[in-house]
């Protein structure tokens, strides 16, 4: 049983998503919801933690918030790396961030000040790994991107003690999209 699951992955531009109307975004959100559900049921996850970073983290937090109606014991925590993280976000992303922040069961800032140096982002990854029992990462080893910084800490923790890292890969996403399209074709 893992009480606390950290979720991270790519920022939108790293996977070619440049707005909330992207045609594959609903599939990605559904895949995140499906994977969170699977891990919740298999390991009795109680908390989902993200930093509220645009992309996979916000979409996963949104999915977890929606899943709370089916799983009332599921809680969501948003641990932003610094104050005013959202001030440079595009309006649609800022709206989603505010929704996630407002609907999180716990929210706080890891560093208690506005952004002033990259060390705040490193400490975010380290802090979230330390506060979690397992992680879910949307990641492709051939397209490193920002998840690699989180994975550095997660792999380090995994070598020291039991710390499962669950992956959601582009191949997994493609398979889920094909399955969903097949289901829609037959229904």
Residue ranges of model-derived segments:
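Acidic/glycine-enriched connector segments
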Residues: 1-186
């Amino acid at each position: 049983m893992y009480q606390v699951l950290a979720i991270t992955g790519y920022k939108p531009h790293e996977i070619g998503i440049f707005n909330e109307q992207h045609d594959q975004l609903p599939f990605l959100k559904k895949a995140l919801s499906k994977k969170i559900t699977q891990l919740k049921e298999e390991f009795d996850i109680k908390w989902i933690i993200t930093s509220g970073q645009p992309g996979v983290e916000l979409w996963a937090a949104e999915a977890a918030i929606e899943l709370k109606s089916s799983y009332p014991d599921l809680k969501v925590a948003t641990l932003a790396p610094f104050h005013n993280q959202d001030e440079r976000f595009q309006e649609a992303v800022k709206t989603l961030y505010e929704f996630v922040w407002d609907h999180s069961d716990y929210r706080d800032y890891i560093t208690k000040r506005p952004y002033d140096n990259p060390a705040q982002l490193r400490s975010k990854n380290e802090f979230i790994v330390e506060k979690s029992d397992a992680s879910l990462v949307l990641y492709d080893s051939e397209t490193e991107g920002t998840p690699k910084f989180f994975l550095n800490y997660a792999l380090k923790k995994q070598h020291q003690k039991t710390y499962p890292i669950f992956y959601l890969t582009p191949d997994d996403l493609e398979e889920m999209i094909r399955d969903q399209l097949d289901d829609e074709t037959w229904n």
